[in-house]
Amino acid sequence: MHLTLFKELLKQPKPKFHFEIEPNVSFLAVEEGPASLRSYSIGNVSRIYDGIRVPPKPEEPLNCCQSGCAICVWDVYADDLEEYNRARRKAKRHYLDKHLPVPPDLAKVSLKETSSLEELPPQLKAFVLLEKRLMKDKQSKNN
């Protein structure tokens, strides 16, 4: 009985969308900060849409110390979020250009280039912008 059911399940048609799930992969360069500054839930994995890799959606950090670190977890989060959104736009554009059906999880992706900081709550957006400005000021003083 169970063997017959299992064989029937194996005969199920495959989905029409071309994407694969791969283990979590770090997408930022090593000099931008250690991977320990990032946090992902189990199951939050990178995907490949018809050959285009989309990193896992970054999660808001819970471990910011608010002391002005050289590499703040919020800076890493903002950069990861920007890369995530850029990759999703690229994947959706690829499907549209090839006149392929767009996967449901890319259907609501806007092709308009916007700052990923717009997705943050206003207080966090202001904090991240302040951190980035302070980091630029610090770098310009060192040069």
Swiss-Prot record:
GO terms assigned for molecular function: oxidoreductase activity
Keyword Mitochondrion: yes
Location of the Oxidoreductase-like domain: 48-93
Alphabetical UniProt keywords: Mitochondrion, Transit peptide
Subcellular localization(s) per the UniProt record: Mitochondrion
Keyword Mitochondrion: yes
InterPro entries to which the protein is assigned, alphabetical: Oxidoreductase-like_N, OXLD1
GO cellular component term, pick one: mitochondrion
Pfam family, one: Oxidored-like
First and last residue of the signal peptide: none
Family from the record: Belongs to the UPF0651 family.
Name of the protein this chain belongs to: UPF0651 protein P31B10.02, mitochondrial
Organism: Schizosaccharomyces pombe (strain 972 / ATCC 24843) (Fission yeast)
